[in-house]
């Protein structure tokens, strides 16, 4: 990880090149060593925004990128999330802005504090002596705040929803949950209103697929097809190698191999946080019911970051328990590895 600077969020202003500010307000965000899968708020969006910020910083027309998230001061999480500033690369910095209680909050609890975040950002940009050329907000909470700031500052705003409240409500209703239960747990009415506001005010809306545009955004009142841009997520090719002889992480291999009778077999690797939508139980069913797969390959399950299973979000231990029951039912001991990620 690059060095952190907790004492200053200032940087010398420059008139050369674009200044882009990215907002990703919920979850646990840091420059690297992401705790992906720790909870529902700390998932793929974290890596998406950090790698996007880093990639934007490498563009020759970009002078500066600030990734803005929430400052968290809470003994239950790493002290890194309390640092006011963290360097990602030469032109890219992560800034943590305090708003709401100091403790870690799930995204559903952040809505009452977004107006204060807007005030904090106006003060932040004033201290910089420079207003961004573009705001890019990720998820509904950031979209609501960025929409307000875009109107106040008179600058364009790009919105990426990542997931949408209307779609989530339909899925939960289909699972048999009541409207009252859904609203109490997920505050979807507030979220959908924020998404509508973001769609109304955004100059451009980024989706990952055409299906996302046609089957999800199209259900919104402020859906404007001309503003939609489909930009599939990129991939960091430096993470991959064709040198099969290199074993750069022997400790990782050892943690996976210790569960297996024959570690030399090819591996089916699955990485996901324990969530109903990931359909992990069906994966175990398919593997367990296939003698050919079991003969030819091992199965490895990397199920998100955790320090203590007793402190995980309530649904996650239940999912893990169901997976363990299936592993026992199909007698997969020695063929499946489920190490504790670190």
Regions found by a protein language model. Give the residues of each.
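Catalytic cores of nucleotide-sugar-dependent glycosyltransferases that transfer UDP/GDP/TDP-activated
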Residues: 1-342
């Amino acid at each position: 990880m690059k060095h952190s600077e907790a004492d200053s969020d200032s940087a010398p202003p420059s008139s050369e090149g674009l200044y882009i500010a990215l907002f990703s307000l919920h979850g646990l965000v840091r420059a690297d060593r992401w705790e992906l899968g720790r909870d529902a708020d700390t998932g793929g969006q974290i890596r998406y925004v950090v790698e996007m910020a880093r990639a934007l910083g490498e563009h020759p027309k970009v002078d500066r990128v600030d990734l803005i998230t929430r400052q968290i001061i809470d003994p239950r999480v790493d002290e890194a999330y309390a640092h006011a500033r963290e360097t990602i690369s030469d032109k890219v910095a992560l800034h943590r802005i305090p708003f709401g209680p100091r403790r870690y909050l799930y995204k559903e609890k952040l809505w009452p504090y977004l107006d204060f975040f807007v005030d904090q950002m106006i003060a932040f940009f004033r201290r910089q002596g420079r207003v961004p050329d573009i705001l890019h907000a990720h998820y509904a909470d950031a979209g609501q705040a960025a929409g307000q700031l875009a109107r106040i500052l008179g600058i364009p705003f790009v919105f990426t929803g990542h997931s949408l409240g209307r779609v989530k409500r339909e899925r939960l209703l289909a699972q048999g949950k009541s409207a009252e239960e859904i609203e109490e747990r997920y505050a979807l009415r507030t979220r959908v209103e924020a998404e509508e506001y973001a769609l109304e005010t955004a100059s451009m809306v980024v989706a990952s697929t055409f299906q996302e545009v046609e089957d999800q955004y199209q259900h919104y009142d402020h859906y404007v097809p001309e503003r939609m841009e489909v930009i599939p997520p990129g991939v960091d090719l430096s993470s991959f190698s064709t040198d099969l002889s290199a074993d750069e992480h022997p400790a990782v291999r050892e943690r996976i191999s210790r569960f297996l009778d024959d570690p030399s077999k090819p591996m089916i690797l699955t990485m996901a946080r324990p969530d109903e939508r990931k359909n992990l139980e069906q994966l175990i069913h398919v593997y367990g019911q296939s003698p050919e797969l079991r003969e030819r390959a091992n199965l490895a399950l990397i199920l998100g970051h955790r320090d203590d299973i007793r402190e995980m979000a309530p649904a996650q231990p239940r999912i893990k328990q169901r997976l363990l029951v299936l592993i026992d039912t199909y007698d997969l001991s020695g063929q499946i590895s489920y190490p504790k990620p670190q």
